[in-house]
């Protein structure tokens, strides 16, 4: 019964988390929760803040750095660094690379304006044990868009079966 409910709710628009509109579904949050039960990253990097509800969810699981190219109004949290910038700005790229290098384990989430480019650019900086997820799987990003990077960086699928089971638009990999 839960499985049927999760499938039904998986792609529901206008989902909320803690009363705020969120672009992810409840099945996505379930997958993130499973990830954070298994891994305890000391930094969560989120590309694409949107309205900040997922940022709030992430903040319950650790220190977050969220980057968006638009300045929007949303709630602020003490363990979140908010940055308004282009994620492909060479200075921003260098800063992200440095942060990844200097943290024990990083959870990296691609959900800004160009998920293909985000994944293909930033996956190269991940260390062994780091995790990368993308949103809008099969809509805005497909396997053929990132297969070369997956192979080159020796990324292994993470919770893909669960994502498929619950019709989630997430896909994750671990290095």
Where are the regions that the model predicts?
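A short alpha-helical cap/connector motif
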Residues: 1-108, 112-175
